Amino acid sequence: MELGLKGKVAMVAASSKGLGFGIAKALAEEGATLSIGSRTKDDIEAAAEQLRKEKNTEVLSSVMDSSNPESILEWTNATIREFGGVDKLVVNAGGPPAGKFEDFSDEDWQAAFELNLFSAVRMIRATLPSMRKRGGGSVLTVTSMAVKEPIDVLILSNVMRSGVTSLIKSLSVQLAADKIRLNNLMPGRIKTCLLYTSPSPRDRG
């Protein structure tokens, strides 16, 4: 399939395994140059090496924490230094812990905000200047089917990912004139390593 991605530079967050890694593989198959980031050095380097061997593509791997603003900027700047700019951004992050409303403190809510909502704001803001300079680009945010039908035990995720969806809807209008396309992916249950650690319907009570 020809999707016009050959030679395009794509940044994919939380991409050492699971859905993020799957997205990176799909982009590589279409000829994109990759900048992948994740928190664990060994995991992200192993993912990069696998992509280079299997997909024969250029890959920059970076240790990156989506909840840390300095880390996001360092990853973006490293990508621009290495490849000259950014064309595609995939905003992805792990989910906050499961639990009921009364289980969570202010600190828990703030941590979920930093990880799942503010990370999207920061990544998009960091890459916008490069996309504008290159005449356009695209952003894909990975949220959850829970933005349509909340999962009762995932209240932190439900709230934050719904916020991301609203952010993308708003920015899709604001950035249309810059030829920057924004879309939101709302996956359901996918057979990745996360599936086996996610709460089942029985666990939700």
Language model segments and positions:
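Conserved glycine-rich cofactor-binding loop
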Residues: 14-18
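Substrate-binding pocket helix/loop in short-chain dehydrogenase/reductase
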Residues: 100-101, 108-113, 195
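Active-site loop-to-helix junction immediately N-terminal to the catalytic Tyr of the SDR YXXXK motif
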Residues: 104, 150-158, 170
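Active-site helix of classical SDR
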Residues: 124, 160, 168
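Alpha-helical segment proximal to the catalytic Tyr-Lys
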Residues: 129, 173-177
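Residue(s) in the substrate-gating loop at a strand-loop-helix junction
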Residues: 144
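Conserved small/polar residues in nucleotide/adenosyl-binding loops
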Residues: 196-205
